[in-house]
């Protein structure tokens, strides 16, 4: 990641189905309008957190601990938005 403001968090997937298509779409949508780069890591794999398809390739099930790294001007706001989405089970339940 480039040298810019950044933030990092470990987020546990608590929704029933883990990081599936709809959850990935909600995750990406939470970043809309924010000037950030996002990397999401799980079990040794790292993907672009702004890409729904990349997130889906992780196949992370319920209970997975994701490492989320955010950089850019809106890093803190982005991490807060992503944390809210995950903590609210991607608004599924």
Task: Give residue spans per PLM region.
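Amphipathic, hydrophobic secondary-structure cores in small proteins
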Residues: 19-21, 25-81
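A common structural junction motif
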Residues: 85-92
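N-terminal acidic, proline/glycine-rich, low-complexity intrinsically disordered segments
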Residues: 1-3
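Short amphipathic
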Residues: 5-15
